[in-house]
Amino acid sequence: MSTTTETVTWSQYKPQETQRRLSRSSTITPSVSEYRSGFSKTAFGNIELEEIPDKQGNITRATSNLESNSYPKALDPDACPPKRSIALVLLNNLMSEMSLTIALPISAAYTEILGGTDAFSGLVIGIPTMISLVCLYPMLRFANPKSANGYTLYFRPLIVSCISQIIGHLLYSLAYRAQWLYLILIGRMCSGVGFTMFLYHKTYLTDKNFVGQNRSTFLATLNILAQILGSMAGAFLGGILAKASMHLTDPIWNQYTAGSWFMLFIWIVYSIFLSIFFKEVRVGNTATNVRKPESFTGKTAPLSFKQKFMLCFLSMAAFISIFNVAGYQTSVPIYAKALYHYNPFQSGNFLSLSSLVIAPFVFFSTFLSKWLEDRQIMLYGFMMGIVALIVHLVLDAVHKIPVQPYFVLYSIMQFGFSVGSAPLVSLATKQLHPKYHMITGVVVQVGISIGETVGSICGGAIFDITTVGFIAMNLGIALLVFIQLLYLWTFIKTKTG
């Protein structure tokens, strides 16, 4: 039996204002008992919907127009979603990154034993994000049904990511037993459906409907920190499980499949916790007479030429950042094996140690948003990445690149481009009307998906391209986006926070 409950939510909250402002809105002051019972079950599933009043305890149904480039006036600048929902989204990001990178140390050896090449290994690493790009539109339709009044139901892509990751890891693990090379690729493609969640990690943590302006950059950088920790944990577990299972002859659990089986079990446990603890923050209710926010009525000014150019720039910045990081990550086992005679375990340690080193710096960079603008964070991050690429290019060209300088340069490059790409969505949400928030997320995710796939393929073929050519290519496209950043410098000025 379904129960209809009145849900008054984020976009309708408004602090007490003057009589002139109140004349255009109706105010409801709930009792304590009403607020305590402010969780409801709806037709969207058995997911709790949280309702939180403003600091004065009032819930206001605002019907005034939103400014095209500012946060909704009804939203507290320090507002954020329920903390346990934030934790589950960040954990999903971390585990998704683990699923993406746990194959890095052993991928080349796994594909080789089944008859594949290094380039095919790069394709195995990079294909999931391309599949996520293909599945992006169906997922957008699924997460934004008509009954949601234009808002996003984040639980839907979350649970889809769990199911697809479980199936993907299962197929990847069974490829050795089947002795079929392409089952590895099919398994990774199934996992790619779950990687559509990379879009929703960004949009959830910067959603202007329930994330205040003072929180968006901070949460966006926490999202990058989760990715860094996921890269560290995935590469480390992939290497150590491969080493621990090196002498096993079991066709099911061995050095090539142990990491994938491990992630399969972790995803099963996570999906159970997700179903129990995730709380959907809903910003509208069809059962009430609340007027739909103007941000979704289509009565907003179209994007200007500079705003469109900015979106193209953000997509390209995302592409280049991830292209560099993914390309280098994929090339490390191949590059280190040729130069330093590294095995998969040592390559996994190399990747995980680098992530471990930069993780504290990424964490401290989350507080930079209090003093630095988004554009300044991007500038400093890209500058660090470019300098690391220049030094690596010179050392590689003269064939004087010991493992220690290589490790330092790789870590600086990864840190620079990771931090530089952190505020992309946050910057756009501060510049554009809330109506364009999801479009911004999609544009950035397109750049990330293409960069991940192309970068991984190029990294896997590093010796076919030549090492100097690979590094020079990374440097050239990084300089291109750096020039675009300088061109847009005055246009993308935003407040700190």
UniProtKB/Swiss-Prot annotation:
Record's bilayer topology term: Multi-pass membrane protein
Residue ranges, compositional bias (Polar residues): 1-16
Compartmental location: Membrane
Gene3D superfamilies: MFS general substrate transporter like domains
GO MF, any single term: transmembrane transporter activity
UniProt-listed InterPro entries: MFS, MFS_Domain-Containing_Protein, MFS_trans_sf
Modified residues (Phosphoserine): S64, S295
Gene Ontology CC: one annotated term: membrane
Entry's transmembrane regions: 86-106, 120-140, 155-175, 180-200, 222-242, 258-278, 309-329, 348-368, 377-397, 407-427, 443-463, 468-488
UniProt entry keywords in alphabetical sequence: Membrane, Phosphoprotein, Transmembrane, Transmembrane helix
Region Disordered: start-end pairs: 1-29
Name of this protein: Uncharacterized protein CC613.01
